Amino acid sequence: MLRLGSHVSMSGKKMLLGASEEAASYGSNTFMIYTGAPQNTRRKPIEELNIEAGLEHMKAHDMADIVVHAPYIINIGNSVKPETFELGVNFLQSEIERTRALGAKQIVLHPGAHVGEGADKGIKQIIQGLNEALIHDQDVQIALETMAGKGSECGRTFEELAQIIDGVTHNELLSVTFDTCHTHDAGYDIVNDFDGVLNQFDKIVGIDRLKVLHINDSKNERGAHKDRHANIGFGHIGFDALHYIVHHPQLADVPKILETPYVGGDKASKKAPYKWEIAMLKNGEFDPDLLNKIQNS
């Protein structure tokens, strides 16, 4: 069954219930959340996440396979500052606990940045961090994200992800998030040869590890190593390629999450595009006037 949704907000008093309500308003049947602000470690206690009411709403609206995204401040690739590494490991463990409490099975993680020490050192540090953070009997997988390769990011190739996975003791607890914008920006030709890229991924990492898809267009040409998301059909990947990926038979059971930019000039008037983009990906017809329609809605 096609599970298609977007990033939604989990905040205020409603928390998980509010996230599910927002997702339902977009015509989604899955969604992705941060457990709090992605740029800090301030988090509400689990009992204040309004989980019971949220799960009831999800059940009533056929929401399933929801995904949690770990915050950007976690960098377990940092071998220069021990305090940054330690914070990353400890906070990742507490985020795994929140993910489990929310009933999600996947927590998306940017593998980490080597901060100038080189990819090999960064990957070694990430392996150490994951070995420390993972508890062998947990039922949550860390879904390492394919990265664009901007700055000192690790995980910019399938080989780097495989290297991390191979080094982790309990690697049955690792999966992969395939981000279309990142993979395109990293240099993979998902526009003209997605099947070839998927076969390559299968040979190097294993398609059985692909548990989350981030569906984003890209503002940049292939191989730019930039990571700038564009609205569906309005970037260098294009609608046809993204529609093909969303409906790919080998990925039928993988939840697909949109992280495309809000539409509008100033912050106050920006609007979420997800209701329109989800409808477009379902019906298979690109609307070149979509951004104007969203702005004027």
UniProtKB/Swiss-Prot annotation:
Zn(2+) 3 binds at residues 182, 227, 229. It comes from the Bacteria. Its cofactor is Zn(2+). Keywords: DNA damage, DNA repair, Endonuclease, Hydrolase, Metal-binding, Nuclease, Zinc. Pfam families: AP_endonuc_2 (PF01261). Zn(2+) 1 binds at residues 69, 110, 145. Zn(2+) 2 binds at residues 145, 179, 214, 259. GO terms for biological process: base-excision repair. PROSITE patterns: AP_NUCLEASE_F2_1, AP_NUCLEASE_F2_2, AP_NUCLEASE_F2_3, AP_NUCLEASE_F2_4. SUPFAM superfamilies: Xylose isomerase-like. InterPro entries: AP_endonuc_2 (IPR001719), AP_endonuc_F2_Zn_BS (IPR018246), Xyl_isomerase-like_sf (IPR036237), Xyl_isomerase-like_TIM-brl (IPR013022). It is an enzyme of class 3 (hydrolase). Its EC number is 3.1.21.2. GO terms for molecular function: deoxyribonuclease IV (phage-T4-induced) activity; DNA binding; DNA-(apurinic or apyrimidinic site) endonuclease activity; phosphoric diester hydrolase activity; zinc ion binding. Binds 3 Zn(2+) ions. It catalyses: Endonucleolytic cleavage to 5'-phosphooligonucleotide end-products. Endonuclease IV plays a role in DNA repair. It cleaves phosphodiester bonds at apurinic or apyrimidinic (AP) sites, generating a 3'-hydroxyl group and a 5'-terminal sugar phosphate. Belongs to the AP endonuclease 2 family. This is Probable endonuclease 4. It comes from Listeria monocytogenes serovar 1/2a (strain ATCC BAA-679 / EGD-e).
